[in-house]
């Protein structure tokens, strides 16, 4: 579930998703891409549209659409991660109330704010250099919703390190 594809960060997240599929030699199925608008309601509508296809996993471009997706899944009778894996973008402390705990891609918000403030102060102080584009490295926070724990429990002898290597290599 992407964000609005007229917004630069939504395009970047979509491109990252697409590039990851390609890098892993996974098929890109355009009919399984639903554009949302970063609101709960669009995640809910997208959830109903996507879950009818019984996907193995869903990537959602923000936390609010994830809330809507999980509501749709509950109504349909599908369970995360038993029926589908889920990874969301954004991580906030209040997301800890959800079960399963959400696997997220997190931007370094403190670093983003700090670097933005530095650039703004320079600009206010008269710096007329060209605008800069800085790309911050996100962090993948693996929790229950992606299904990793289920994969480990189903792995022969429960060898978590072996299962982790397999997942990271794919």
Specify the residue positions occupied by each region the protein language model found:
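Bacterial carbohydrate/catabolite-sensing allosteric modules
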Residues: 1-170
């Amino acid at each position: 579930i992407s964000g609005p594809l007229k917004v630069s960060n939504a395009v970047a997240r979509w491109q990252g998703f697409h590039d990851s599929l390609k890098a892993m030699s996974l098929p890109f199925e355009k009919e399984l891409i639903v554009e949302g608008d970063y609101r709960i309601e669009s995640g809910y509508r997208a959830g109903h549209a996507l879950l009818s296809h019984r996907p193995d996993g869903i990537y959602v471009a923000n936390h609010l659409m994830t809330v809507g997706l999980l509501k749709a899944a509950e109504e349909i009778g599908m369970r995360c991660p038993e029926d589908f894996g889920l990874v969301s973008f954004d991580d906030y402390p209040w997301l800890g109330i959800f079960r399963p705990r959400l696997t997220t891609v997190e931007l370094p918000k403190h670093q983003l704010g700090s670097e933005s403030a530095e650039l703004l102060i320079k600009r206010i102080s008269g710096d007329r250099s060209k605008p800069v584009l800085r790309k911050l490295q996100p962090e993948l926070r693996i929790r229950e919703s992606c299904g990793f724990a289920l994969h480990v429990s189903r792995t022969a002898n429960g060898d978590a390190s072996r299962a982790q290597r397999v997942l990271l290599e794919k």
